[in-house]
């Protein structure tokens, strides 16, 4: 399966700082979207990505991306089965902050992966382009940072 998972990609202190930045960035955002609580986007024709990049850990610059989506999931929230837009590149990177999460790949057989605080998940190939993925309801507050590139 073309998936790479790094469970402790960020330190506990980096997670705490970044979760605080996520909360600050979402203050005033009221839009609820598709099972998530709040969403904010940078890059492409969204908000200025470079403005926020100055505040996130240097190691994020190692990820090849030109767009970033910040998702907030309060307890019980999730994102339903979907395939990310084909307008994005072949590989997607997800950093998980806060409570644990279970990502589900709706393949045969179904694959589940637990995502911990500070973990980095990347997936590509058929998992990216033809197999739907979702998350199970969050047991507590969680943020995800989704890094993508244009095709």
Residue ranges and their predicted role:
Residues 1-151:
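Non-heme Fe(II) oxygenase metal-center motifs and adjacent flexible, charged/small-residue loops
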């Amino acid at each position: 399966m073309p998936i790479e998972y790094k469970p402790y990609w960020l330190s506990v202190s980096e997670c705490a700082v970044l979760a605080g930045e996520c909360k600050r960035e979402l203050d005033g955002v009221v839009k609820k979207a598709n099972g998530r609580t709040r969403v904010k986007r940078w890059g492409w024709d969204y908000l200025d990505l470079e403005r926020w990049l100055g505040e996130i850990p240097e190691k994020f610059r190692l990820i090849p991306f030109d767009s970033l989506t910040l998702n907030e999931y309060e307890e019980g929230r999730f994102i339903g089965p979907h395939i990310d837009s084909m307008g994005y590149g072949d590989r997607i990177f997800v950093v998980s902050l806060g409570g644990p999460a279970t990502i589900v790949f709706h393949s045969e057989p179904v694959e589940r992966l637990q995502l911990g605080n500070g973990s980095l998940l990347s997936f590509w190939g058929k998992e990216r382009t033809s197999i739907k993925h979702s998350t199970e309801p969050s047991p507590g507050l969680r943020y995800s940072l989704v890094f993508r590139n244009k095709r």
